[in-house]
């Protein structure tokens, strides 16, 4: 079953309860960071992308670039020949070079407009056999949909104010019954945070923390739940044959992509007698540093990610709170001097 027009009362877990394990903040301007992303451009057999899509995906900067801290994925109307095929539209399809199992994903994005545009923020099993995909040559063992597909956000220009989430598994795929969505009147005029929480039990989909779909099959097996293995992220705009003749180009603008996990790569360091804990992470206006008695009196220095020292604090109690409201958004380092040396931690200011 699926839900379309009502909301679950379930609420996503506050990301403060998670640790940030991977992100791209798309700082600066220029090319997409190739350490984080792979441009998938190889056409499937048959010479066209699935679902009747009519675009070429390219690795050119005109189709994907960073400008003033925003990733722009651009679908364009232009004649372009690649792999022996000439098409009239181009776009970009990015695969993350990071795969993970379970956690919370947040993507802050503004969507394109126009009938025939099909932007998506989604995930595929790292084990997918897909010629041209980033992970296929090293991890590919399963075809689609046995690998599992998680659509965090899909949007069709023909239904401008509606966004959808969906699941594709061997039990239901393509026109899957496992889907739900909500109306977002500002989907193309303002950024929204598209989120999913993925655990061993269920998937919770939301926009700006308003839940619109929960996938929690009563029976979990390879047919209904191929989701106990790592998945990776994809960002793209597809073009449908129904694209308007007046279309010239459209952009999906992405402010950030963040992946959080519980108890993984934590900013928590603990031995039998020593504890240092930074929270929340990400932080907004205040950073808390909780320490065991061993560290009371120690210095905590905050540095920019480039190594510039910004502040020095004394940890004068077990619970210490420091004002970071004047810091710009981004990553920072905290170095704490102890008898055993210097311990370094990273946090994100939002």
Model-identified regions with their sequence ranges:
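GH16 jelly-roll
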Residues: 1-264
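C-terminal outer-membrane/trafficking sorting elements
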Residues: 268-350
């Amino acid at each position: 079953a699926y839900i379309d027009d009502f909301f679950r009362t379930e609420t996503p877990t506050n990301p403060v309860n998670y640790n940030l394990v991977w992100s791209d903040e798309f700082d600066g301007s220029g090319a997409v960071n190739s350490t984080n992303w792979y441009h998938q451009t190889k056409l499937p057999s048959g010479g066209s992308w699935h679902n009747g899509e009519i675009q070429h995906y390219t690795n050119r900067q005109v189709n994907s670039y960073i400008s003033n801290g925003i990733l722009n994925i651009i679908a364009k109307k232009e004649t372009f020949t690649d792999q022996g095929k000439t098409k009239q539209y181009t776009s970009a399809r990015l695969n993350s070079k990071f795969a993970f199992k379970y956690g919370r994903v947040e993507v802050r994005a503004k969507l394109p407009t126009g009938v025939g545009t099909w932007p998506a923020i989604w995930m595929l099993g790292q084990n997918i056999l897909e010629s041209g995909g980033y992970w296929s040559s090293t991890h590919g063992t399963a075809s689609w949909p046995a690998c599992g597909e998680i659509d965090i956000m899909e949007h069709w220009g023909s239904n401008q104010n509606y966004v959808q989430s969906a699941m594709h598994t061997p039990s239901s795929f393509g026109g899957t019954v496992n889907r739900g969505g909500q109306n977002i009147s500002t989907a193309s005029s303002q950024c929204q945070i598209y989120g999913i929480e993925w655990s061993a039990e269920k998937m919770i989909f939301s926009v700006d923390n308003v839940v619109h779909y929960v996938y929690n099959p009563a029976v979990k097996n390879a047919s209904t739940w191929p989701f106990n293995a790592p998945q990776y992220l994809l960002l793209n705009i597809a073009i449908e044959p129904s694209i308007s003749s007046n279309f010239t180009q459209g952009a999906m603008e992405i402010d950030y992509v963040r992946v959080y996990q519980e108890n993984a790569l934590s900013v928590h360091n603990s031995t039998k007698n020593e504890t240092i804990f930074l929270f929340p992470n990400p932080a907004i206006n205040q950073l808390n540093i909780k320490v065991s008695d061993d560290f009371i009196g120690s210095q905590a220095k905050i540095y920019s990610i480039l190594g510039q020292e910004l502040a020095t604090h004394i940890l004068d109690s077990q619970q210490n709170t420091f004002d970071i409201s004047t810091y710009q958004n981004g990553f920072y380092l905290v170095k704490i001097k102890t008898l055993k040396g210097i311990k370094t931690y990273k946090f994100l200011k939002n």
